[in-house]
A protein has these predicted regions:
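Phosphate/nucleotide-binding beta-alpha loop and adjacent structural elements of enzyme active sites
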Residues: 1-260
């Protein structure tokens, strides 16, 4: 009992410390944590460098992973490199990866794609708050076609996914429809909770204009070996990112001659 209380207190303190990164101080951080415990959907507005952004209690794990632990920091040079890189953020959640990329390169042209209607509302709010005209967002589910599909929403907002038993309907968008008219795509980030097989394997040739792809695989939810096989035919250079907190594989794929 005592050990459990100590563990919970330590976790609360650790979370309060990193939450101060986005809020005015410890009092604001504690207030945010207590309100989120009562209602995980309650909205808080904080700051990430020059950007105001909003988040919920159910988004804490995403905040920690993307902005505190800087999981995508290995992409810094790729985002900095082109003067105005074209980036597709597929499975954008509330837009944290996009915010990170805009901090690295304020003139990046980003399209964020998010399936969950509730999460999309926060994403849309963050796009507006950023005041970046090069950042746009659409409420669609990355899929093998553009049909309407069912979507399951669960307590941890990072784990929403396509599911035949899901209670939410959302229109799909295929890889071809998403990339059509974009020209060269400097970077595509994909984190879509198991839909990566349907999204990428339906028409791999459409990946031709994508210079770099970073993708999280979900072995329990799709045939990730099939995804790997498809990617190896398109991207000669593939590295699995090591040292992650998550056990899910994160692959960084590049075309021949494309710098890291």
């Amino acid at each position: 009992m005592i050990a459990s209380l100590v563990h919970r207190a330590r976790n609360f303190y650790d979370r309060m410390q990193w939450m101060e990164t986005f809020l005015p101080g410890p009092v604001a951080a504690v207030s945010c944590l207590l309100r989120a415990r009562h209602d995980p959907a309650v909205l808080t507005t904080g700051r990430y460098h020059d950007f105001a952004f909003s988040f919920r209690g159910c988004d804490f794990s995403a905040l920690k992973e993307v902005l505190v632990d800087a999981e995508y920091s290995f992409l810094t040079d790729a985002v900095k490199s082109p003067r105005s890189p074209v980036i597709l953020d597929v499975g954008a959640h509330i837009g944290l990866f996009s915010l990170w990329a805009l901090h690295i390169n304020p003139v990046a042209q980003i399209m964020s794609v998010e399936a969950s209607p509730g999460t999309f509302r926060i994403l849309e709010r963050n796009v507006r708050q950023s005041q970046k005209t090069g950042w746009t967002a659409i409420n669609r589910a990355a899929w093998k076609n553009d049909d309407t599909i069912r979507f399951a929403e669960v307590p941890d907002s990072m784990s929403h996914r396509v599911s035949v038993t899901g209670g939410t309907e959302v229109k799909g968008i295929s890889l071809a429809a998403l990339t059509g008219g974009c020209g060269d795509i400097d970077l595509m980030k994909v984190d879509i909770e198991g839909a990566e097989e349907a999204f990428l394997c339906a028409d791999p040739a459409v990946l031709a204009p994508v210079k770099r792809l970073v993708i999280e695989l979900h072995p329990q939810l799709c045939d990730t070996q099939r995804v790997r096989d498809v990617l190896q035919k398109v991207f000669p250079q593939i590295a699995e990112i090591q040292g992650r907190t998550s056990s899910k594989p994160l692959l960084y794929c590049r075309k021949q001659g494309v710098s890291p």
